[in-house]
Amino acid sequence: MRIGYFLSSEEFGPRELVRQARMAEQAGFDGLWISDHFHPWNDEQGHSGFVWSTIGAIAQATSQMKLTTAVTCPTVRIHPAIIAQAAATSAVLLEGRFALGLGSGEALNEHILGDRWPAVDTRLEMLEEAVEVIRTLWQGGMQSHRGRHYQVENARIYDLPEQLPPILISGFGSKSTSLAARIGDGYCTVGPDAEAVESFRSQAGGGKLVAGGMKACVAKTEEEARETVYRLWPNEALPGELAQVLPTPAHFEQASELVSAEQASEDVPCGPDPERQLEAIQAYADAGFDELYIQQIGDQQEPFFELYANEILPRFNDSKPQQGVFVGEGARA
């Protein structure tokens, strides 16, 4: 299983994300995920830059790692034709190192233009048609599309990459997993769910990528790490479909008052012990994932990269960390 780094656009500004991307490459991570949000989940996280601008900067700051959006919603806030152009441009800049991760989105980000937030079945239907629009435009030449949800009239993407990026579909339930198997080049999810992986593979056939995301918090003590997780990411422990339907960071903050500190960090490896990190990672390997992308919660980025370069990545990735690279690169932004 290959190990990558998960860049959090909700928790860090664009300049800091570029800095983290450089450190991740130097530490020996195999790839990058980057989240795409209009809003953070809560005000404490405090950021949400425009991901496509950040991707352009990362393309120039790195030279080896694949970069995947994790994930972009191409259905409500941004028309899939615009996503098709943005992804094509990113693929040109990254020269074969870009993958487009797509999902059905959350009201938190997609409600901002006043559009009605659709029911889950409609959202999946829109996602399927959005992928059709994107792939149609990636064929090159003048294209039109007249579907149930989207219209495209005489549109052409002039800058297409030599190698079209794969499209990964995010899934958290049986319906979205089946959709990913049917229309995606790969599948991405969070949590070491072996049943979901098996369901995807049984429907998709062989050869399609399965990638996962995981949060971690490296700190001087386990207690400090758990406090950091609770302060920044209590929303991760919210049950059911709340993450898809709550419309603002304030609503997430209100709902998160029902989450205890223990619940918030229950599934997050916390503290300085590499064995705790390895145990959490191994669960994904045992579940059958091909790739795992790990997000460090909080501002202890240098200790995280040091620990992973020296203790974690050598057990999984083929790449070796460079020496002397974990020096601060200026103030975070």
Indicate residue ranges for each PLM-predicted region:
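Active-site-adjacent structural elements that line small-molecule/cofactor binding pockets in enzymes
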Residues: 1-333
